[in-house]
Structure formats: C-alpha cells, structure tokens
Amino acid sequence: DAVRTVVLVVDPDEALLAAIVDTVRPDILQFHGSEAPEALAVTGAQFDVETWKAIGLGDASALDRASTYKGCADRLLFDAPPALLPGGNGEPFDWALLDRADIGMPWALAGGLRPDNVAGAIRRTGAPLVDVSSGVESAPGVKDIALIRAFCDAVRNAR
C-alpha cells in the first residue's frame, strides 16, 4: 500500500550496485538486462535489498526463461519486450500470455500501463502489483502529478 523506492539497472557491476545502494538506499533493485539468476540472488543477499527481474514477454517462451529466476529473484516484472532501451518504453504486451502461466513466485505487471488502461490490465491479468514509468509522464522523463494521482486512483478502483 506504500510507494517504494525502485532503481532500474541494466547489467550493473558490483561497484555500481554498491554505489547505488549506498547513495540511494533503494527498497528494490529492478534488473532489465541479461543478468543471470544467480547474480540476483547474490545481489539481494549482499546488499539486503529486494531484487526484481524484468522479463520481456514477446511470446510464451519468455515464461520459460522467467522460471529460471524462481528462488533467485524476489519478484518477476512482466513487461513488454525491450525496444531500443530497456524499461519505460510505454508499450503494452499481449496480456493473454499470462492466462495459462504458472508463475509460482511473486510478480508484477508493467509495460504501457497508463491511467486509462491500468484497471483493465489488473482485471484481465489478476496482477497483484503494477509498475509504471512513462505512463505517468507529460513529456519524456517528466513525471506528471495529475497523471500519477489518476493512475493510483485507477489502481485502487480496479478491484
């Protein structure tokens, strides 16, 4: 029920992770690169921080890849497949890919979520948690308080 501090990283080395944790003190490190499952387990233990692994769902085979993170990441973040840059691309994926998924660990939904579609996404997928970035921006990189408020209201009213 609270907003938590999340830092998005892509294939970070240990020195960068140490600097991030020391400076920002995030609640969560969200990994959007090609990090190995074991690396997330080590990072979580070493820095005493939650680790989330973003999985781009372009097709059902990505769910097989996701299963390799069970017991290593604290949560999976199902997102649209990366375009040019990982994370925050503003594109939804085919939520039907989650219909038959036996995820077996905590997960969250991301990818193209906005105030006008997040309630439907939650109802369609049963997502226990949602993640947003560009869906609450008035311009690239500029968060809009009215959009954030509308997004949070839509999430609260989705259930």
Language-model features and meaning:
Residues 1-109, 113-117:
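Conserved anion-binding
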Residues 22, 45, 120-123, 153, ...:
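Short, well-ordered alpha-helices that flank and scaffold nucleotide-derived cofactor binding pockets
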Residues 116, 122, 127-136:
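Internal alpha/beta core interface subdomains
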Residues 107, 124-125, 148:
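Alpha-helix termini
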Residues 41-43, 133-159:
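C-terminal helical cap(s) of enzyme catalytic domains, especially alpha/beta-barrels
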